[in-house]
Structure formats: structure tokens, C-alpha cells
């Protein structure tokens, strides 16, 4: 009789009749593995960086990485094209090793391993950039500078005008006047943070005159326009693609990120 009672107890326990037992985790509830780190994804510097999925509005999951430590942080907004976060990776590595700057890099919707629902590209880029700044602040950043190249420069200007609390500075490397309904001149007129603009005279996408117009439109006193040598565009102006021979502009941008606005 005792054996029968014990057997019945085991059966009832296995049934979970009180509804308190939890089903095994399904594949959908198991966290996805982190995206490849920049050293693997991009090549170039082999510095270890933390890769992660950056959540953005609408259910977007963006391939992202952070390198370096400390409260002084740069959030990089890449150019259009397939390179995504890789375009700024060598520079971010240099900042971490030589300037004590932490960098947040991410690939926008439609680039790299980032996964996004269908939607307006402009809205997605702006929302993703805002999410990256928020992530940086949530993870210890006390001083945040947005740095954008080409289209990323346009996006960086726009986000710098709208995000609250404000970022501590913004850098526009060859960002054109307009992109898919976003007007850089209108954004420049609303800026209330230190702003650095850079352009090369041989740039076929944006002229020195256009960049000077954006610079002059910024109402704050703390601003600077750098006309670099040659014909580079966007992150090309920084030089040092192989991790060396960084341009004078690269040093200027690093100082801007560190809060030395001159």
C-alpha cells in the first residue's frame, strides 16, 4: 500500500496540476549570441572589444560594440555603405589605446548583421543613433560626443539638436547639406552644443562653401571649421586606416571628444 501511495505521488508531481511549474525555455526565449566582435568582423586592430545587440525602437536589433573604458565617450555614426561600424573601428581602437576614450560603434539598419523591421530609413537611423547615446549613458558615460561621417554627420547633427539631455559635443566629417529629408542647415541653426565641422577641398560630395555655411549657422560660440588637405571624404579625413599615421584632424577630433574645444 505504501508503495502505491508513493508511486501516485510521483505521478501527480510530474503532472504539475497546480500550474506552478514552468515549461522549458523555447528557442525564442533564449538570448541570441552576441554579434562578431570588430576584430573578427572588420579585421585591422585585434584589440578585444565587447560586442552586443543594441535595441532600438520598432524591435530593431543593431550589431554594436564598445571599446575602451572611462566616462569620456564617443558615439560613432558611420557612412552609408556596407562597412557599417567597421569604418570607424581603427580610429576607435586608437582612441582607446592612446586617449583614454571609450567608443560606442554600431551598424545602422540595412548594414552588417543589424536586424530591423521594414520602415523609413531616415527615422531608423535617427532612432538608432539616439538609442546608442542612451546606451552609453546607461553604461557609465558622463561626457558624450557624437561623431558622424558623411550621412552619419548629417544624422549626428540632427540627433544633437533633439536628444535630451544634450550631448556634450558633435563632430560632422563631410556631412552633406541634405539627406532623405533631413536638412543639415536647419539642424545647425538649432544646435546648442560645441560643434566641429571638417571637409576637404577636393571632396566631390560636399563643398567647402556648404560646410562653411553650416558652420556659420551654428548659434553657439564654441565651434570650429577645419578644411583638411586633399580630397578625402568622411572617415578618410582621419587617415590611419592601418592603425598609424593619423592626420592632424584625427588629433583635433580626439581633443573635441575629450572636451577640449579649441
Model-inferred region functions:
Residues 70-71, 78-83:
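Active-site glycine-rich loops that stabilize anionic/oxyanionic intermediates
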Residues 30-67:
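N-terminal cap/lid segment of alpha/beta-hydrolase-fold proteins
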Residues 191, 197-199:
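Short beta-strand/loop motif that positions the catalytic acidic residue
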Residues 81-93, 108:
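The serine-hydrolase catalytic nucleophile loop
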Residues 96-115:
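Conserved alpha/beta-hydrolase
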Residues 119-139:
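Alpha/beta-hydrolase active-site loop
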Residues 184, 206-216:
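Short alpha-helix in the alpha/beta-hydrolase fold that links the catalytic acid
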Residues 148-156:
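Gly/Ala-rich beta-loop-alpha elbow adjacent to hydrolase catalytic centers
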Amino acid at each position: 500500500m505504501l508503495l502505491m501511495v508513493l508511486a501516485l505521488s510521483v505521478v501527480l508531481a510530474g503532472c504539475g496540476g497546480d500550474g506552478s511549474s514552468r515549461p522549458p525555455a523555447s528557442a525564442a526565449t533564449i538570448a541570441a549570441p552576441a554579434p562578431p566582435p570588430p576584430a573578427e568582423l572588420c579585421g585591422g586592430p585585434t584589440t578585444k572589444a565587447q560586442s552586443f545587440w543594441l535595441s532600438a525602437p520598432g524591435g530593431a536589433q543593431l550589431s554594436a560594440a564598445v571599446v575602451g573604458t572611462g566616462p569620456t565617450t564617443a558615439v560613432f555614426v558611420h557612412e552609408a555603405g556596407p562597412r557599417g561600424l567597421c569604418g570607424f573601428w581603427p580610429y576607435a581602437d586608437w582612441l582607446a589605446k592612446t586617449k583614454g576614450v571609450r567608443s560606442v560603434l554600431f551598424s545602422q539598419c540595412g548594414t552588417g548583421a543589424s536586424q530591423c523591421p521594414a520602415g523609413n530609413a531616415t527615422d531608423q537611423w535617427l532612432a538608432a543613433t539616439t538609442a546608442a547615446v542612451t546606451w552609453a549613458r546607461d553604461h557609465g558615460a558622463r561626457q558624450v560626443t557624437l561623431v558622424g561621417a558623411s550621412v552619419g554627420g548629417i544624422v549626428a547633427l540632427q540627433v544633437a539638436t533633439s536628444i535630451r539631455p544634450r550631448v556634450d559635443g558633435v563632430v560632422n566629417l563631410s556631412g552633406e547639406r541634405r539627406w532623405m529629408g533631413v536638412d543639415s542647415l536647419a539642424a545647425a541653426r538649432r544646435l546648442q552644443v560645441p560643434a566641429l565641422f571638417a571637409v576637404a577641398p577636393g571632396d566631390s560630395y560636399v563643398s567647402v562653401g556648404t560646410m562653411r555655411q553650416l558652420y556659420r549657422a551654428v548659434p553657439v560660440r564654441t565651434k570650429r571649421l577645419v578644411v583638411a588637405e586633399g580630397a578625402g571624404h568622411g572617415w578618410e579625413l582621419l587617415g590611419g586606416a592601418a592603425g598609424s599615421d593619423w592626420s592632424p584632424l584625427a588629433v583635433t577630433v580626439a581633443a573635441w571628444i575629450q572636451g577640449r574645444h579649441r
